[in-house]
Regions:
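Carbohydrate-interacting/catalytic domains
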Residues: 2-10, 14-170
Length: 170
C-alpha cells in the first residue's frame, strides 16, 4: 500500500523482512541480508522507495481527490484491485494488486488516458525472488471498454503480486 495516498511509515526492520518484533534493547537483524529472501526484499524496499521519490504522482496530491482514482475496486471473484495516481504535471501511474494465488493473463485494466504503459516495478520480478511473470514490453492501450473507461490495457498479473505502470503518452 506504499502507492496509496498518504504518508508512508517504515518502522524499524520492515525493510529487512524481520521475523521478530522490534525490540528497543536489540539492534536490527542486518545479518538477515545474507539470506536471499531477506536480501531481495531489502532490494525491493529500496527500489520501491526510489520509485516513490522519483514519481510526483505518488506524493504531490496525497491529500487531494485529483491525485487518486479507483479503476478496479469490485472484482471480488479475482481479488484484483487497481487505481490511478496523478500529478499536477500530467504524470499518470497505474497501480495493480492481486490478493490471491491465481495468475491472470491478459487481465483488462481500465485506463484513464490512451497511450502506452510501461511497467516500472513488479513484486514478481526475479531479482525479488519472484517467478518473473512480468510485463516485459510496454503495453499500448486499446479502445476496449473496461469497467467505466473507454480504454484498457491487458496485463499479466502474478499471484500475490503488485505492480506499477507509468503512462508514456502517444
Amino acid at each position: 500500500m506504499m502507492t496509496h495516498p498518504g504518508k508512508k511509515l517504515n518502522f524499524m526492520g520492515n525493510e529487512l523482512a524481520e521475523y521478530k518484533e522490534w525490540d528497543e534493547k536489540k539492534a536490527l537483524g542486518w545479518v538477515l541480508l545474507k539470506y536471499p529472501q531477506h536480501d531481495s526484499f531489502h532490494k525491493y524496499f529500496s527500489d520501491l522507495n526510489h520509485m516513490i521519490l522519483s514519481h510526483p504522482a505518488l506524493y504531490q496530491y496525497d491529500y487531494y481527490p485529483e491525485g487518486f482514482e479507483w479503476l478496479v475496486v469490485d472484482d471480488n471473484q479475482q481479488s484484483v484491485f487497481a487505481y490511478a495516481r496523478y500529478a499536477p504535471d500530467g504524470e499518470v501511474l497505474i497501480c495493480i494488486m492481486n490478493f490471491v494465488g491465481n495468475t491472470h493473463e491478459g487481465y483488462k485494466i481500465p485506463v484513464p488516458v490512451a497511450g502506452t504503459y510501461k511497467e516500472i516495478i513488479n513484486t514478481d520480478t526475479d531479482c525479488y525472488t519472484g517467478s518473473h511473470f512480468i510485463n516485459k514490453r510496454a503495453i499500448k492501450s486499446k479502445k476496449v471498454p473496461a469497467v467505466h473507461k473507454e480504454n484498457s490495457i491487458a496485463v499479466n498479473i502474478a499471484p500475490f503480486s503488485a505492480m506499477v505502470f507509468e503512462l508514456k503518452r502517444n
